[in-house]
């Protein structure tokens, strides 16, 4: 019996003007996801996916490169304006926003959606180096 070959579908170009940039910036990495207004992903990138490893992954430069590559991929779908939501305490927050603006996307709003507990779970113990 002949095996079926897996054919990859060609990515369909959508024509989306406005979208949302979700920037998740942790102490170890920065992940940038560009979505339409409903939250369906158009493109994404991260510092780790670009080949930055170890402590270089958490730098503002790595976040800037991640935002640039995600923006270029999303602009192929016709993206022009963005609302930015930033989550997390990492170093790449501002760098990623600046990179999105420099790539030619118009940022209409910046929102901080970092989750803050109302005294929920006990945090991990402090590091002693």
UniProtKB/Swiss-Prot annotation:
Top-rank taxon, per record: Bacteria
A cellular component term, taken from the record's GO annotations: ribonucleoprotein complex
Keywords from the UniProt entry: Ribonucleoprotein, Ribosomal protein, RNA-binding, rRNA-binding
GO molecular function, one term: rRNA binding
Gene3D superfamilies, alphabetized: Ribosomal protein S11
GO biological process: translation
Family assignment from sequence similarity: Belongs to the universal ribosomal protein uS11 family.
HAMAP family: Ribosomal_uS11 (MF_01310)
Functional note: Located on the platform of the 30S subunit, it bridges several disparate RNA helices of the 16S rRNA. Forms part of the Shine-Dalgarno cleft in the 70S ribosome.
Subunit structure: Part of the 30S ribosomal subunit. Interacts with proteins S7 and S18. Binds to IF-3.
Name the record gives this protein: Small ribosomal subunit protein uS11
Species per Swiss-Prot/TrEMBL record: Bacillus cereus (strain B4264)
């Amino acid at each position: 019996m002949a095996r079926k070959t897996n054919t990859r579908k060609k990515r369909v170009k959508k024509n989306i003007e406005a979208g949302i940039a979700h920037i998740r910036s942790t102490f170890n990495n920065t992940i940038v996801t560009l979505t339409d207004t409903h939250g369906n992903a158009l493109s994404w990138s991260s510092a780790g996916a670009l080949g930055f490893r170890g402590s270089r992954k958490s730098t503002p430069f790595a976040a800037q490169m991640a935002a640039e590559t995600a923006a270029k991929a999303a602009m192929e779908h016709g993206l022009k304006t963005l609302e930015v939501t930033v989550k997390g305490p990492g170093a790449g927050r501002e760098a990623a926003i600046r990179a999105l603006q420099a790539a030619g996307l118009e940022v209409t709003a910046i929102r901080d959606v970092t989750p803050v507990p109302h005294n929920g779970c006990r945090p991990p113990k402090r590091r002693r180096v």
